[in-house]
Amino acid sequence: MSNTICLKQILAGEVEALEELLKIEEKMGNILLEGDAKALHGLNMQKEEIINTINEAEKQRRGVYTSSLTLKEFILKEKPPAAEELERIRRRLLQLQASLQRQQKINRHLLKHNLRFLEYVLEGLFPQKGVPHYLSSGEVKQKIIASGLLDSNA
């Protein structure tokens, strides 16, 4: 089998894997909005499997395509029918990577927001007693401690 055909198959496999990864990231975004945190674990396991698949495809690609040329440069040297197909796959890979980066950025933002909200709720339930502050005279200045909802002092 020629290197071009083999490269095409490997890249097509990477496209499929990235499409699956994007679907999972979109599901994760919905879960982060809806709050079903238990479902995140299963999706993270699926993501790990897909990432391993992508890494394996990348190793195969390096085995087939050992040139120092970029994929775009390689395509420019190919003959028209094969070059057109490889260019279509290359553009799809770029599109998927951009979509994946955008969705991951959204998910990170949602995750940070959820963690800040959780921290706010926990602070309301279990307020920190604060560290004593010392005045220049050596006396201890205590912060006024608000009672939390579950505080035994409330």
Where are these regions (language model features)?
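Extended, charge-rich alpha-helical scaffolding segments
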Residues: 1-77
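Short terminal interaction segments
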Residues: 78-154
